[in-house]
Each structure stands twice: as C-alpha cells, then as structure tokens.
Amino acid sequence: MSSETMIREKHDGALDDRTSVRLWLRLLTCTTVIEKRLKRRFADQYGITLPRFDVMAALDRHPEGMTMGQLSQALLVSSGNVTGVVQALLREGYVSMAASPTDGRASIARLTEAGRDCFTGLAESHHEWIEAMLAGVPREERVAMYDLLGVLKTSLAADTGEEQP
C-alpha cells in the first residue's frame, strides 16, 4: 500500500472539472494530518497544547511583548481564545503581563525566562517533527510547493468574497 492511500481523503483524488475543490480538499487533508500529529506529540511528550505552543512562538518572535489584540491578529484567532491561552501560560510561569505604557486598557504579554527556555525545547522538537513528516518530499519540490502556495495566497488575497456578475 502506498503512503498516499494510507491517508484517507474526502474524495478519490482524481482531478476533473472540480480541480479547485479537489486541490482545496487535498490541502485540507494534509494540514489536518500534520496538525493532529503535532497536537498528539506536544500533548504526549510535553503536556502542552498546540495553541500554547503557537502563542509562545508568537511571543518568541516579539521579545518586546504583544497585546492580546496583536496576538489574536498574528494567530488569526479571536481575542477571547488568546486570553485563555495566555492566562494558562501565566499560571505556568511561562508568560508575564505588564500594563502597556501607551494604553492603560491594554496589557503586554511577554515570555519569561522559563517560557523562553521551555519554548526552545518545544521549537526544536517541532522543527524535527515537521522535517520528519516532509522528509519524503525532495527539497526542490518543497521549494516549488512553497512558491506555488504563495501564488495561491495572492489569489486568496485578491478574492474579496463578493459575488461576481
């Protein structure tokens, strides 16, 4: 049995006049499989959720800290979702909160030293897991897929969602 048939898709994979829908379903299948594996590995090996990893990753990229609004925009989720995750990381000692010097209504979340140390290990494992999952795809093909997905991203940005005449 080939590795392609071991992962079930929502369609048979054949391309016809519904190429766009089938492409979207294949992208969804791949994304879902990768996400499920990451969730399971983070939970099993570190006792942490993927959303906590995502928040820590965003804060690691912004050592100056981020507001809940900035975090929600960066992670493409609601502020309510981010707040719960940040509160859990705060309880665990991985994140600190401080009042914003420019906006009294906002708080700035930052990784603590313990949070940075924890994230370093998480990020190394995350990188290794992704590399292992994509190891069967030659580097040149990964680069080509990345470039093609950039074209898709541009197409998505151009679609306003309004009905076309």
Model-predicted regions and their roles:
Residues M1-Y46:
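N-terminal leader segment of winged-helix/HTH proteins
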Residues S2-H11, Q87-D147:
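Charged, amphipathic alpha-helical coiled-coil/dimerization segments
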Residues R22, D54, V143:
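Active-site phosphate/pyrophosphate-handling residues
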Residues W24, L28, T32, L76, ...:
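Short amphipathic alpha-helical segments with heptad-repeat character
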Residues T31, E35, K39, A123, ...:
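Structural signal for well-ordered, non-membrane alpha-helices
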Residues T32, K36-S78, E92, P165:
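N-terminal helix-turn-helix DNA-binding core of bacterial DNA-binding proteins
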Residues V143-P165:
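Exposed, interaction-prone assembly regions rather than primary DNA-binding/catalytic cores
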